[in-house]
Amino acid sequence: MCTSANNRLDQLTQILHPENLLNPTNASHPESSLRPDHPFKIAVVGSGNWGTTIAKIVSENAVARPHLFSHFVNMWVFEEKIDGTNLTEIINTRHENIKYLPGVKLPKNLIAVPDIVKAVKGADLIVFNLPHQFLPRILKQLKGHVPKTTRAISCLKGLEVNANGCKLLSTVIEEELGIACGALSGANLAPEIARGNWSETTVAYRVPADYRGPGKDIDKLVLKALFHRPYFHVNVIDDVAGVSIAGALKNVVALAVGFVEGLGWGDNAKAAVMRVGLLETIKFAKLFFNDAEIDTFTGESAGVADLITTCSGGRNVKVGRYMAETGCAAEEAEKKLLNGQSSQGIVTTKEVHEFLTNVNKLEEFPLFEATYQITFGSESIENLPNLLNNY
């Protein structure tokens, strides 16, 4: 990031002090970005454990920074019954998502909304946070209901693959809705963050060509103010491609780590898989996304830190481990272990295989391909070391 941008972000702690927000003259470095014409309205699309956690964070900041953000934050919830009661009703009365984030108290200004169009109505910023296989249906429902001046952040992990190539999910959102979209990813296990354990993340956002100016539009300072908490530290960069690719491909690597963990091969084997996975992730970025910055993969929470965390636990490792221990199929493991949530590694493994097949590059990514063949083909986990000999 350029020096001036770093300097602006360094001023954030002082500027966001409540006294400085209420009395701009108190701040030695006034920032009009953080004194908008009107408070920005935020909506979150998705209510799994990560979606609910992010909604909790932005709702807390809406209360802490009333000059900057509208008080109420809408969270779109796919309606379902829990013991005969709608999940939205439970969230709005008990202030707890008892299915996907049990035991965590949610802010009272977080409102669960079952109608997605109503949930995002009037939003200046939409945070997308749901399994990426549901994104096409969601965007179809939103098309025509979101003004072009709305901005978005994608917390989704995955890629869109079709006959025309491979796209970032932030790009899909931009193209389908005609709005600017960045990405958020990092070493972020939702249950730890939801309980207030310290963590850090990376937000990537490029200010669009139709940016309306400080105080009138979402920019990097506003995004840092929205997501940064004492327990959740945020770095804002430009590299949307790097953050998105790292967030997608780490789940493939985690699935493979689960395989070797399930066979009891130990930490050395897991480290070997992670090393190869990082190399293949960087190679994938260099080959197919020219604007991705390699420093993102080594220096940001969204890069190697996220890879380490994801491969140390989480749903993809659990699924891979269970498959190795029991010999069951990926879908069966997912259904048994994840309480209705998705293992993004399974979906992304298939998408990466399809894309690499289309561009005739399978042989250059032996770990990604081995993970696919173990998950969907007839390859054995025991043969994994032989498939990685070239590394």
From Swiss-Prot:
Q: What class of enzyme is it?
A: oxidoreductase
Q: What Pfam family is a match for this entry?
A: NAD_Gly3P_dh_N
- Kindly give the NCBIfam families that the UniProt entry links to this protein: glycerol3P_DH
Q: What is its EC number?
A: 1.1.1.8
> Could you tell me one molecular function GO term of this UniProt entry?
NAD binding
- Does the keyword section mention Oxidoreductase? yes
Q: Might you name a Gene Ontology BP term for this protein? A: glycerol-3-phosphate catabolic process
- Which positions in this protein are listed as binding NAD(+)? 46-51, 78, 134, 190, 315, 344
Keyword line: NAD, Oxidoreductase
Q: What is this protein called?
A: Glycerol-3-phosphate dehydrogenase [NAD(+)]
- Similarity annotation: Belongs to the NAD-dependent glycerol-3-phosphate dehydrogenase family.
Q: Which residues bind substrate?
A: 157, 315-316
Q: Which reaction does it catalyse?
A: sn-glycerol 3-phosphate + NAD(+) = dihydroxyacetone phosphate + NADH + H(+)
Q: Which organism is it from?
A: Candida tropicalis
Annotated GO CC locations? cytosol; nucleus
Give the residues annotated as active site.
Answer: 250 (proton acceptor)
